[in-house]
Every structure is written in structure tokens, then in C-alpha cells.
Amino acid sequence: MAVRGEAAQDWAKPGLRGPSPAPVARGDHRCRGGSPSSPRGSGCCWRALALQPLRRSPQLSSALCAGSLSVLLALLVRLVGGEVGGELESSQEAAAEEEEEEGARGGVFPGPRGGAPGGGAQLSPWLQPAALLFSLLCAFFWMGLCLLRAGVRLPLAVALLAACCAGEALVQLSLGVGDGRLLSLPAAGVLLSCLGGATWLVLRLRLGVLMVALTSALRTVALVSLERFKVAWRPYLAYLAAVLGLLLARYAEQLLPQCSGPAPPRERFGSQSSARTKEEIPGWKRRRRSSSVVAGEMSGCGGKSHRRTSLPCIPREQLMGHSEWDHKRGSRGSQSGTSVTVDIAVMGEAHGLITDLLADPSLPPNVCTSLRAVSNLLSTQLTFQAIHKPRVNPTVTFSENYTCSDSEEGLEKDKLAIPKRLRRSLPPGLLRRVSSTWTTTTSATGLPTLEPAPVRRDRSASIKPHEAPSPSAVNPDSWNAPVLMTLTKSRSFTSSYAVSAANHVKAKKQNRPGGLDKISPVPSPSSSPPQGSPTSSPVSGIASVQFPESPEVTTKRGPGSHRALTYTQSAPDLSPQIPPSPVICSSCGRPYSQGNPADGPSERSGPAMQKPNRTDDTSQVTSDYETNNNSDSSDILQNDEEAECQREPLRKASACGTYTPQTMIFLDKPILAPEPLVMDNLDSIMDQLNTWNFPIFDLVENIGRKCGRILSQVSYRLFEDMGLFEAFKIPVREFMNYFHALEIGYRDIPYHNRIHATDVLHAVWYLTTQPIPGLPSVIGDHGSASDSDSDSGFTHGHMGYVFSKAYHVPDDKYGCLSGNIPALELMALYVAAAMHDYDHPGRTNAFLVATSAPQAVLYNDRSVLENHHAAAAWNLFMSRPEYNFLVNLDHVEFKHFRFLVIEAILATDLKKHFDFVAKFNAKVNDDVGIDWTNENDRLLVCQMCIKLADINGPAKCKDLHLRWTEGIASEFYEQGDEEASLGLPISPFMDRSAPQLANLQESFISHIVGPLCHSYDSAGLMPGKWVDDSDDSGDTDDPEEEEEEAETPHEEETCENSEAPRKKSFKRRRIYCQITQHLLQNHMMWKKVIEEEQCLSGTENQAPDQAPLQHSSEQIQAIKEEEEEKGKPRAEETLAPQPDL
């Protein structure tokens, strides 16, 4: 029947009528051409119209089949009943007696009332219950088929029947309902309650009603009709038939083809089997990058697309030059006839997994050696595959301007797509990344948490200064043009500045004051709260009692001072003689002029820009700040071109949309440093700068109400001590102007204020200038260095090494970081420390994201504060010519300097803390270790240095540590109060009514500061001093704190000739480190406070949530040097806690 119906259905379709058209034509002629009175023609048409809905609707056809089968079964039951009723009357009494006897014992009756005698009637007693059970099976078959096609899985349907069996057992056993009362209302109510509750959990309303109604009806039929069985058995037989029917439905659903009609709501995307497969098998999808530029290039290739379907459409020509690719195909692919394609992303993931395994200290040495060898092989392949980009022509100078096109930004980003994916996958987290979660930490508590991994691609931040045409065609005032900030349609946030030809290199001071044009789409941290922020938000300004402002500073700030997120250059006036604001390309985000096409190129042919680019650079930083949100700068690519502005502005004007500034803010005058520039009454305290526990709060008290100048004064002393003013020809007045404006931009909040910025600046200066035991130096003496840096390509005429005037090398067994880090990178680290918390609102990143602050929206909830600090500080620097203290840096050096500063600021995001620590540990534990000639390694060291300086409070002496702890606690409590006022859940450790200061500090030291100090100290970068055995005789009994020193080429005990005998083979050398000593002492102090609080509260057992803290506490006490492998330049150990020296 089904085959015939399907054939009829196919025959009814227009396109499936078969090859013989003659019969069809005759049929059509009869239906159309027949007379209306012809009964044969009219009957044919009416039959076709009546069967057409049945053919097209699977529901109607299924209902018709179920109905016909039910009618047949009913007729069969009727025939069985008639046969039984026509039996001989003589056997009724015997059958009745036998029925009563069997009914009393329980079991199957041998025959019905009036059973027929003889052998011919022996099958009739079994025919009626078999027919009834078959009917129940068929009914559940159709119901199961309906449920399966609706998306219900077979185990769920069987579970519903199990719920029915449980209800029956509850009715019969627990409630004690007799056989005669199974159809009573209480029994039916209990059973329907069980079934309905189970159905409500797994089925939708329509399917649930169908299931309950049909099951209850069939149970009633079974209780009434199955007279051959005991009453208590009848429901279970019905459920058994139901299970068989569901199994048959599952089997039939797999065999029968799916209907071509519209599928149910859960099946409209495919067949039932495919849907169940998708539900049972989780789908792991790779994040893909779509680009209109890449799509356009791929569409224009015209050849076969050699790529995996799960990877982005990036042609090989983007990964390496055309000539290199043709050469590789000629040398390799021509030999075998096929080209070997390597999946770079998979190799990157494998390299990351191996690096993660290497971080495990419990691995055997042979396993570590094998894994390290595989990691080196993968690193070579990754470098070979991913960083094949055309080199810059050494004869091309950076003074040339390139054409600004629509696709320039997209091409540059697509070329960096693969390395960005590698940078995102290579650094493993300190805690293993499992499934779709990653480890992170909140900046508030320092406790590690788990967050869902982001599903969006990381956005890059690119801020690009731009040179306008020459002064011969434009206004010669290089700082008159306004700063324009816009959001481009590319994947990065571009802040384009319209600056004239001699931007920061030949900046001139303006001659007359005037209005200041400005567009500021970002809220200002001035006295008025920004849009979208509550009135009580710290963005509206928090007056601090501890650090009052002087009237002089308050007067200079004014009601509309430049404490905004974006700053602009002042213009003399708004007269018509001034050229109009440059137009910004809406495609690439770069400004271009609409002036005369005959305007000459910008004047960039000075001596500073004449030197050619090095051709032997292995790794050169990108010309712009182009990095992912992970702030992982290990894979800095060689820059293939300087993306300058267009040389002919009007040639591409028709192809670029325009963006016109909408908002203008007028500022009167910049904030300048007051006289005298250098305060002369601070020498007594400034002489203590070379101590780790610098009395910074005493300095605040000495400055008094002028404490707003603390950052500029300390910055001047440190720069002057390092000789940076002479090395880079920094003008003192511009330097003091900018740093004074920078310190004014810090808000008066308890912790993240200008005093904290000064403390971090002093900490990075101390860590980079103090003697470090056993640290090898790149240069032999002060000032002697090679002609050029092997990695960056900068000559040491401007990139030499500087040392502190207070640095005195005791002997050749000490070194310092300033002897291994070039001066430009060192100055970038100091400037980043001063900028790193500029305009901090006193709230955490999590709070800004939770309240949908404008900064969180602007930076896509990623490193919100860190991006804001860097952008606002650089915007301040570029806003006025009076702030340009880098006037003598050439264009390449300035871009490199800016890149380093931004990377260092973004590294202070504690959410990426574990990634940095794990990456640094992997670098230190590598065979090569830290390569001081590699710019990437030096940048990683600088990032770790500023991270340690940013959280150095627990590593200070007790008095300073308690002062900083009081400040951070006050700031946390203010955020907790605001969260409570906004109806938000109060963050951990921020509830003023339930202070947990000791737990906060103990956990912060255990999870954040301790591992960071341990990693930094294990790399041999922590300042300290050698201690002889005679100086620590009381502490040498502990064997765990003693290690034998390995052979190093710089030790006195090792002879120059490796074959010559040495005076001493081993000598136990120990190091005293004041920083780690303070850290251990403060950690023990907070542990004792926690124990005392627990004793006072009557808690003898430690809380469950502090068990991991205790484990970390024990680990943090072991901050000592590991035994170095052969060939390492340092092998020592750290002293146990001792009294201060």
C-alpha cells in the first residue's frame, strides 16, 4: 500500500510523469476535454482533487493509515468475539467453573466463557488477547513514530513509560489499591500525576498532551479488554507492548525514507538522524576571520583554492612573497608533482601544548629534553612558515609617502592574521586551559577564576601619527591642526592625527593663543560626570583627604581644563585664513588633504631619516602599534613597509568616504610646569632614591600642598641620574611640562593616584639600575657597545646603554639590567611606568564592564583601563607642542618608542598575569634562556619588570606595605559602596561591612605577587648581593637552602682554560635579596593575622576556601634559586628571611 501511494504521489508531480506521454495525454484529455455531464470525466477529476491533500500531507496519510489499521483490528476483535459467542452452550458451565478456579489462583485463563470444545477451538482463547496486544503495539508504534519525528529521542520516550510503571507500582503496592479499583479515580489520578510530571519535564505541551491522553486511554482499554490475564498484570502488558511499539517505530523511522513535506519545527534544518547526531556530538568550531579584501583577492585568483575548509581564506601570496612562493614551489613541488601544505594553526597549537607540558616541573629530564627538541623544531617551522614577508628595500627611506587606498588597512591586517592566531595560541596559561574556559584573575582580588573563552577575534589598537604636506602649501604651524579621533570600519581602533610635515621632530611653539578645536566622543574625567555614568561614580571626581590639591594647581586646571580623554592642539583663531580641518578616510582611517594636487611631498629628507634600513634584520617591530589583546609580543614581525599618508591626496578622494568632526571643545591654554621647574628643598629625601624602601610618603609631606608635583620631580631626578637628558637631547622645560600635566591627570583617589605612579616609576628604576649578582652584561664597560643592535637595527649613536650615576660595580660578579637594555627601551619603560595608571577612575575593569561604562564599550570589554591609560596619556602628549620632549627622536625611533610604551602599559592588566608568567618561565627554562640581543626577549623582561613594580606593595617594608594596603582597601570599599547603591552584587573583599583585609593580602601574595617574584628571581634578575658563608653561618644548617654553584665563565673559581685545574670545584654562594625577604615577612604577618582572627572567632578548623591558600603559602616561602643547568651564567640561592640590613 505504501509503495503504491508513493508511486501515485510521484506520478502526480509534474516533473515525474515517466517517459511515455501518451497515456498521460489521454488522461488529461479526459479530465479537461470531457463533457461536464460525463460521469467518468467528472469522477476522475474529483478523485484527483480528493487524493491530492493526502499525497502532499504526511500527517493526513499517517492518520489515514492509523485509522484504517485500527478499523481492521476492531473488526478482527469483533470476529473473535462473535466466534466465541457462537460456541456450544454445553461447555459454558465447565468453562465457568474452570475460570473461577484459575481466577482464584491467578494466572492465564485456559479459555473464555463458552469456549468451544474440540481441537478446533483451542486457538480462539489466545486470539483475543493477542489481537488486543497487537492493537496496543500498533497504537504505540504510531505514537512513537510521531514523537521521534518531532525530535524526541527514544530513551526519553521509554523513560516516560518507566514513569508509568512506577506509578502503577505506587498505586498497587504503596496505596494498596485492589484489582477491582485500578480504574478508580484515585488510582487514575496518581498514575496520571506521575506520567504528567515526567512528561512536563521532557516534552512540549502538544506532545505531552498527546502522550498523556493516549497512554491513559490505552491503559484503560488494557484493563477492560485483557480478560485472559490477571488485573494487576494488564497495565504492565500494555506498557510492554508500548515499548515494543516504540522500538519498532525507531526501526521503521530509520528504514523508511523521510517525507518531502515541511518538517516539524525542530527538524526544518535536516533529517531526524542528522539532528540527533548534532545533538549528541558536540560541535567544535574554529573561529574564522572573514575579510572583504581577502575574499576579493581569492575571487580574483581564478585558480583552485588550496586551503582547508575550516581555515580562513588566506592565499599563500599573503604569507610570503610571490618570488619566494614560486621558488619554493619550483624547488619542492616540482619534484613530486604535488605541493606539501602545512597547517600553521595546528602547528601553533601543538607548540603551545608542548610548551605547556614543559612548564610542568615533575617531568623527567629525558622527557623534557625530547619535548624541548620537538618544540625547537616546531618553532623553526613556525618561523619559516609564518614570517616569510617581503623585506623592505634598503634603498627606500622612510621619508616617502605611500598612497592611501581603501584596501591598505585590510591588506596590512590580513598579512598579520596568521601570526596573531599563533600569538594567541602559543603562550600557555599557568593553569591549564580546559574546554571552553580559560584561567584569569580579577584585578580586585587576585584570586584565580574561570571565565568563558571569548568567541570574538581580538581587536588591535593602532594609533598612527601622520605627516601632512609641506609647510610651503599648508600653515607652517605644526601644532595648529586639530586632533581627530574616529572609529574606522576596520578591525582596529585608529586615532589619526592631522599633523603638519615636521610633526614631533620639528615642532614649533605657537605664537598667539586662541580657541582649541576638539572632538571628544569619549567622556571626560573632568568635574562633570560622563554620559551613562551614575552621579556617584568616581568619574565625577573624588576629593581625597590624604592628597589635597594646591590652590595654584586648582586654578590652573580651570573649569574646562584638558583633563579629558582626548586632547587637541590649539589653533590661533578661527579665521578663514586657516585651512579647513582635514578630511578622514572612512575606509582606512587616515586623514588626507583636499588642497592643491600640486602640493609637494612632506619634508622628511632630513639627516635623521637618511640612514637606510638594515637588510639583515631578523625581526623588526611593526611601524604602528599593532598587537592583539593578549599583549603577547613574542612574535613581532618584520615591517614590510611604512604605511604613510598618500602622496597625491586627490587621486583617491573619490574612492574614500569622509568623516567630518562633529563636536568641538575650546581650551584656553595648556597646563605648564610652574617655576622653579626643579624644587631645591627635596635633596635630603631624593638622596634616598637608591634604596628599595624609598620614603615616598615623607616626600609627600615635604612637598606639602604642592604634592601634585611629586611625579614630575621624581621623574626629573631619575632621568637626570640616568643621563637620559643628554643621551636623547631632551628639553627640560617640555619634559617638565608634560610630566606635570600627566600628574595633574591622575585623580585624587586613595590608591591609583600620582603617588602610586611615582612609586612604580621608582620601582622600575631600582630594578633596572641596582647590582644583580651573577647577571652577565652585554657590554664590558660603561658606554662601550657594538655599533648596532642585532635585533632592532638602531645604531647606538642614539641607542647606547646608560647607567645610573649611583651605580658602582663591586666586582665583575655583578651586573644590572641597564647594561643589557638599550637606552631607548629603558626610557620607554620609565615613561610607561609614569603613564600606566593615568586617569584611573578608582574602579576595576570588571566594574566598568558590569556598568557598561563608555570606556568598556569603546575597548570591547578587554583591558579597558589599560587601553584607556595608554590612549589618554599619548593623546595628552600629542595635544600640545609644549609637551613634546621627544623632539629630537627621528620618526622610526619615535614609533618604536611609542610601541614599547604601549606594550608595557598593556602588560599591567592582571587578567593576563598568568599568561605572562608562564611565557616568561618557558623562556627562562629554555636551553638558550634570555637572549639579550633579541628585542622580543628584552621586551618580555621589561614587561615583567613593570608588572613587578606595579604590585610591589607586598614586597616593601612593613610600614610602607601597610600604607599601601590601607589605600587599596579604601578604594575597594568605595567601589563596594557604589556597587551596593547601584544594586549590583558586591565584589569579593569590597564589602565594608565584612572586611577581609588579611585574606585579601594573603591571597594576593600567594597567587599573584609570590609567583611573579619567584619567576623573576629564578631568571637571575632580582637585585641583591652575594653573601659569604661566614656572614650566614647561622643559616647554613638547612640543606634545602644550600645549592652547589654550577660552572660559569664569569666566576673567579673557573679558569679560562676548561682543561686547566680549578682552585675550587664548588663553592656555596648565597644571595641576600631584600625584596623577597620583605615579601616573605609580610606574607607570614598576614598568615598570623588570619590565625588570630580565626582564634578570636572560635573557628578551629580552616575554612574550605582557604585550603588552597595555605598550599600556596607554603609554596611562596620557597622563593629561592633552582640549581642551574650546565652553561647557565648564574647558580645561587636566596637566603631565608633575615633581619633587615
Swiss-Prot record:
EC number: 3.1.4.17
Modified residues annotated as Phosphoserine in this record: S310, S492, S520, S524, S533, S1033
Residue span of region Disordered: 1-41, 89-111, 262-309, 433-479, 504-643, 1024-1062, 1098-1141
Positions of the UniProt region annotated as Interaction with SLFN12: 669-1141
Sequence ranges of Basic and acidic residues compositional bias: 454-467
UniProt biased composition (Acidic residues): 1029-1046
Cofactor: how and how many bound: Binds 2 divalent metal cations per subunit.
Keywords: cAMP, cGMP, Cytoplasm, Hydrolase, Isopeptide bond, Magnesium, Manganese, Membrane, Metal-binding, Phosphoprotein, Transmembrane, Transmembrane helix, Ubl conjugation
Chain ranges passing through the membrane: 62-82, 127-147, 157-177, 182-202, 207-227, 229-249
InterPro entries referenced in this protein's UniProt entry, alphabetically: HD/PDEase_dom (IPR003607), PDEase_catalytic_dom (IPR002073), PDEase_catalytic_dom_sf (IPR036971), PDEase_CS (IPR023174)
Membrane topology classification: Multi-pass membrane protein
Cofactor(s), names only, from the UniProt record: Mn(2+); Mg(2+)
Sequence position, cross-link Glycyl lysine isopeptide (Lys-Gly) (interchain with G-Cter in SUMO2): K1120
Residue stretches of biased makeup (Polar residues): 618-637, 1098-1113
Superkingdom of origin organism: Eukaryota
Gene3D superfamilies, alphabetized: 3'5'-cyclic nucleotide phosphodiesterase, catalytic domain
Ranges of biased composition (kind: Low complexity): 433-445
Sites where the protein binds AMP: H752, D837, D950, Q1001
Sites of Phosphothreonine modification: T1036
GO MF term (any one): 3',5'-cGMP-inhibited cyclic-nucleotide phosphodiesterase activity
Subunit structure comment from the entry: Homodimer. Interacts with PDE3A; direct low affinity interaction which is stimulated by binding of 17beta-estradiol/E2 to PDE3A and that positively regulates the ribonuclease activity of SLFN12.
Protein name (Swiss-Prot/TrEMBL): cGMP-inhibited 3',5'-cyclic phosphodiesterase 3A
Organism of this sequence: Rattus norvegicus
Gene behind the chain: Pde3a
